[in-house]
Regions:
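Extracellular glycan-modifying ectodomains
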Residues: 2-139
Length: 139
């Protein structure tokens, strides 16, 4: 590993350690339109308390999911066959598509979605919408 990479890793670790010390809320539910929430949980050393990990929704679908949150979360996700993607895609309430881009199979994605969905604390939520890459399609 080169010196630049070592310095960046050192600084990253120091910043994360300082942020963990300053953290007052150890159980947030982060609802993010892309992978950002997973990074935040990881950097702070927190348990994933949200199903919105390793996936993305388009900004339009993300807003629709938030506007109808209970219905969206409580409706089973169905697999989209022949999505044209090389990763699993699901569709939930109101036709909202979920792109499970960091999962190998739909079964794995749904298992994690349902497991983490049980940890949601609706009284301790933070929401983050990203329009990175023109549609939230990159993590």
């Amino acid at each position: 590993m080169g010196i630049q990479k070592r310095v960046l890793n050192f600084l990253h670790d120091k910043i994360n350690a300082k942020n963990r010390e300053r953290l007052n809320n150890a159980t947030p539910t982060l609802i993010c339109s892309n992978c950002a929430g997973g990074f935040i949980y990881h950097w702070l050393g927190l348990q994933f308390r949200s199903p919105f990990i390793n996936l993305f929704l388009t900004p339009e679908d993300f807003v629709k999911a938030l506007e109808n949150f209970d219905e969206f979360i409580d409706t089973p996700i169905q697999e989209v066959k022949d999505s044209g993607k090389d990763y699993p895609v699901g569709v939930g309430a109101l036709g909202i598509k979920i792109y499970f881009m960091h999962y190998k199979s739909f079964a794995e994605a749904i298992e994690k979605w349902n497991e983490r969905k049980q940890r949601i604390d609706k009284n301790n939520m933070g929401v983050m919408l990203s329009n990175y890459a023109g549609g939230g399609t990159s993590c």
